[in-house]
Amino acid sequence: EVYARAARVELWLNGRVVGRKALKNDCLAKFSVPYEPGRLEAVSYDAQGCELGRCTLTTAGQQTQITAGPEQSTVQAGHLCYIRLRYTDEKGITKPLARGNIKVEVDGGTLVGLGNACPYHERSYLDCVADTYYGEALAIVRAGEGSSLTLTADDGMYSTAVTVPVTR
């Protein structure tokens, strides 16, 4: 399924067109495409044939790791730092089917929230462990007064750490 507010959509699989559809008022085009690893790209066009946008999905590799990415490269002392935790491959492509309970530890700050976007998430957001939802979770850390904060994430199989400079 491709959702777009456009006149038509093309679907590309690994560099070749596998379908074209005109869209109606529901902004939905359905395609049936056999699975093939690689790159699936939807390109939307207006009535004059000008490109409006594109969206790409890429198959993740075999290797799995936890990636921790702060929303901003620095944080002010006392302010909140949002750190996205994801299961990814070696190229940083999210692996939405990977799932685990990630334990978070913070040095140089305070963990104020940890969770995911799952609508039936049963754990407390104040806990230091969160299950991933479609391969992702989010940690919210209040920066301390030191020069940096470090978040370590570990699920018992994979681990990562990220350090964020703290400014005053």
What kind of feature is each model-predicted range?
Residues 2-8, 97, 146:
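Short proline/glycine-enriched turn/loop motifs at strand-loop junctions of beta-rich domains
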Residues 2-3, 43-44, 78-96, 102, ...:
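Beta-strand-rich structural segments
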Residues 8-12, 43, 101-105:
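Beta-strand signatures of extracellular beta-sandwich domains
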Residues 19-25:
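Short beta-strand segments within Ig-like beta-sandwich modules, predominantly Fibronectin type-III
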Residues 30-35, 126-145:
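Short, hydrophobic beta-strand segments
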Residues 35-39, 78-80, 146-148:
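Extracellular Ig-like/FN3 beta-sandwich strand-entry sites
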Residues 49-61, 158-167:
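Edge beta-strands of extracellular beta-sandwich domains
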Residues 63-65, 105-121:
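Short aromatic-acidic-glycine turn motif
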